[in-house]
Amino acid sequence: MKKLQKGVRDILVVFALQVAWCKIIFFALFLLIGLECEPTSNITLSKFFLACVFAPVWEEIAFRYIPLTIAIRYFKKSFIQITIGSAIFFGYIHGSPINIMIQGVWGLMFSIIYIRNGLVYAIASHALWNFYCLTQ
């Protein structure tokens, strides 16, 4: 039960940090370059499944479970570099240069959850974040 409480607490803390970070970054972009966004509409079941189930499972396995498990077992001295590299690559696959920074930070946060609590909690945190983004 304590592990569940710790995992849920970590997910909520990371989620709060993500929302705050995102609001600060996008508010700054709105002010600096006049960036505007439109509310999301027409969320289909397939879009929901892709964003909130498939992507979190696949990305957490590909960017956290595989590289960090290998790093822990075989490359302990390079663990931090591998974690940062994985987070940067995670950001890179999400597109634009601004996404490399934003998603890279999320990758580091998901890595912390993975290391502290395990894969299921990292997937849950990632799914929660994607759900939040999908519904904004």
Regions found by a protein language model. Give the residues of each.
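Juxtamembrane helix-loop-helix connectors linking adjacent transmembrane helices
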Residues: 1-55, 61, 68-74
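Transmembrane helix-loop-helix hairpins at the membrane interface
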Residues: 45-136
